[in-house]
Amino acid sequence: MTFNEQPTGTTGALSPLIYQAYDANYTQAGFYYQFEIYVWSGTTTLPITPIVTIDRKPDQFGGGRGWIDAHKIAAQYITTDFLVNGTYKPNIGDGAYYVAVKVQGIYDSGSTAQITSNTQLVTGGWNYTIDGLNADYSAKYVYTDKPAVYITANTTEYYLWYDATQITTIGIAAYTTTPNAVSTSDTKIQGIDVMQLITAAGTSGEDYPIVFSYSGGSVSIPIQYQCQNKYGEVDIHFLNKYGVYDSFVFNALSRKTINITREQYNQPIYKQADLNTAWSYGVQITTPYHTNGIEQIVVNTDYLPQAYNEVMKQLQFSQNILMVEGSDVYSVRITDTAYTEKTIVNDKLIQYTFTLEYNQPVINKIVR
């Protein structure tokens, strides 16, 4: 049997996870391909029982091949609440799971040998169509596409994530720290709070790069302190294409609005004790109900280099955004439906504006 499978690296479960099988016995009576899909956390050892078994008849228009796409099954297990704000060195936890597939051909008079695929780690990330089929993140050591980290003296937290099976130390200036111990799927990808690392290194206010070292090389990302604007900054963490919470500081004008919704009911005026009371100006004849509001905030970036366009595009596609307000963290989403990529040639100075909408109403009516 020929089995086209996923590579062994890490990839996103929001894009197709295609597995394709072909066996010359597909012309046998009653032939079908049986795919067993495994999604689990822990060590790389496959569980005894698959999550689901899918039988596929050979595709007569595809030369007798059979295929499945496992991404929707895997995505059901991946969570987006793995980041506990304030953690110095967080693990990805349930934000990543292992996926593997077994396949064999079964027909009336027999069956083929069962083949087991590679084991792949999947996150809540995605791949662009132009990346090709079954793309993965094997070439990435640090899971961000930002060319630099921009912060202010008032930034409280800022996360970068990396492949903890490859990175050996993370450092600023002469100070270094090491990843948490890696043993299972929930620790293979880890993060670092840049602000706490800066404090530990004693380099607050200084533009030292953060360096992620691995065997045979390193990844260096510049850190630049910017003057905070008079409006106050808006800090967010957003799920990027790699399925981890990338951070960004909106260090320009921001403005909040609340869109209020309500219904109303006109009561009969004769419900009062007497007509004089009924005709009083203080009587609430028109009564509002189901009153609530959705809060939005319009945020603006500071001037950015053109190399930041990919980060802004990933923010637009993000499946979840966390906005930090003091000690509170709110889930928000972008309501803009169009993204215009800006360039130095066309726009000279590059700034972006986004409208963020809170994912919970102003008045607590979440429990139905």
Segment roles from a protein language model:
Residues 2-4, 8-13, 24, 159, ...:
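Extracellular/virion structural assembly segments
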Residues 1-229:
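Preference for solvent-exposed, low-hydrophobicity sequence contexts
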